[in-house]
């Protein structure tokens, strides 16, 4: 999810995408990437970082040209999720997703409610690795494209990296 800033009281959602994975992080399905139309006034008043970043990626122009509304995209994503997952059955997963949820509560409440109340936040593992095993944290290479789909794919790769190099797990029990 990309927004015009970090404050859901004054900023808005401008791009969303979604990927469904299984518990082993294999991609099962991928939604369309939606640029959500927002007013020129809102886009013209983004802070310097968002103006530069979303301008560089072309997202600002895509948002200006889009006819998608938040409500329309919310319904499309609900339809997409319901093909794969029953309501309230899966946590939201990604990087710093508490921020995404804050915006969803305000602008896409039905979608936010479709997720389980728990989160699987890759940022938690990143912060733990920084504190407990800094070389592991430094070994993660982030491109930081700030495009919704790219960021999701990068979060999945980051989670795979932490699973392989940071989390210790017992071998799966053999079927008897």
From Swiss-Prot:
InterPro entries: Exonuclease_RNaseT/DNA_pol3, Oligoribonuclease, RNaseH-like_sf, RNaseH_sf. Belongs to the oligoribonuclease family. The keyword Nuclease applies. It is found in: Cytoplasm. This is Oligoribonuclease. The active site is at residue 117. It is an enzyme of class 3 (hydrolase). One of its GO terms (molecular function) is nucleic acid binding. SMART domains: EXOIII. One of its GO terms (cellular component) is cytoplasm. It comes from the Bacteria. GO terms for biological process: DNA metabolic process. Residues 2-159 form the Exonuclease domain. HAMAP family: Oligoribonuclease. Keywords: Cytoplasm, Exonuclease, Hydrolase, Nuclease. Its EC number is 3.1.15.-. Its main location: cytoplasm.
């Amino acid at each position: 999810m990309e927004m015009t800033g970090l404050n859901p009281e004054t900023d808005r959602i401008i791009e969303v995408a979604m990927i469904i994975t299984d518990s082993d992080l294999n991609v099962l399905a991928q939604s369309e990437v939606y640029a959500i139309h927002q007013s020129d006034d809102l886009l013209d008043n983004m802070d310097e970082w968002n103006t530069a970043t979303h301008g560089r990626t072309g997202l600002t122009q895509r948002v200006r040209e889009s006819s998608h509304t938040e409500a329309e995209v919310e319904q499309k994503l609900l339809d997409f999720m319901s093909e794969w997952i029953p309501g309230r059955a899966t946590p939201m997963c990604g990087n710093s997703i508490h921020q995404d949820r804050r915006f969803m509560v305000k602008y896409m409440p039905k979608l936010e409610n479709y997720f389980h109340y728990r989160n699987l936040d890759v940022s938690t593992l990143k912060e733990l690795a920084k504190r407990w095993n800094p070389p592991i944290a430094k070994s993660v290479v982030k491109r930081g494209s700030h495009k919704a789909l790219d960021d999701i794919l990068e979060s999945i790769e980051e989670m795979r990296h932490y699973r392989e190099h940071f989390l210790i797990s017992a071998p799966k029990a053999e079927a008897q």
